[in-house]
């Protein structure tokens, strides 16, 4: 692909992708959107440069297996392809039919490999056939939790408008200017050789942005794949660079330098001192430091109590994310919507706010309560069996 894109464009796109504060921030954690972004960019280039049908289909199948929102990308790319096909005039039906006949085998192979790839994961290697039915069903029956509705311009505000928060400036304006420069050249009178590719990605970005802006459920990580496409599009600002005027060359070089430097500075803030701070625009409902410290603390507790086990660990209530991720190294962890009768026998208990009072009463004689913060505005109560707590206090009285 580097040979097709051009060395300079590929290098700039890679730098913008690697330095993007949005992508850097969410690459630090397990979240489906980063896999979707990886497979999505691969699928986009496979479509653009007509990779073998099986490779293209596999990339799309991996997107399907990762997240149901892959249909937005598939629709955007299909629409972009159709618009480019019809950009000069409406082709005759005979041309469309001939085009279909020419590519029908490739289309069938790509569709088959996409479905087989997705089915492999959704059916647990074809052992649970119903999984594929549920995968298709979720596209049409989609529920979201409350509190995430945002206005139409949420993503424009997040990326295009400079905002000062937490002592740092947050903006993606230089990158958007580079992408706009690439579009102006591609749609202009002297387009570069990669003009059709640039137009395809530009239309894709606009359709992705429109789709995600119309959907009321919004958060930063949903923009990972569209923003990755913006980074690639911005890289194409260097396409046909040698044929540009001196003023245009100076503009592109200056904006590219500003984009790379400012993105790097924002990324350092995003994953540094503001990693779990709600003033970081990418730290959406961030996890509190209390919970980030929980796993290492529990492991220390296990070390100083070799004759006892800190498992099973019980989590009581709903809305407990990211506890499953934090407690992933503890195999014997259970989740209950309501406190079970044998709760007092469990060494470690975490209770969500709606059950904290009831659990505190049930464990009053056996456990030490320790208030903690889970996410912004969401407390959680940690209960530790008293003998374990006494061991810890003797080990570390601070």
Can you annotate each of these PLM segments?
Residues 344-398:
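Aromatic/acidic, Gly/Pro-rich catalytic loop(s) in extracytoplasmic/lumenal soluble domains
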Residues 25, 58, 64-198, 206-216, ...:
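Transmembrane-lumen/periplasm boundary regions of multi-pass, lipid-linked membrane glycan transferases
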Residues 56, 284-285, 289-335, 339-341, ...:
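Short periplasmic/luminal acceptor-recognition loop of GT-C membrane glycosyltransferases, typified by
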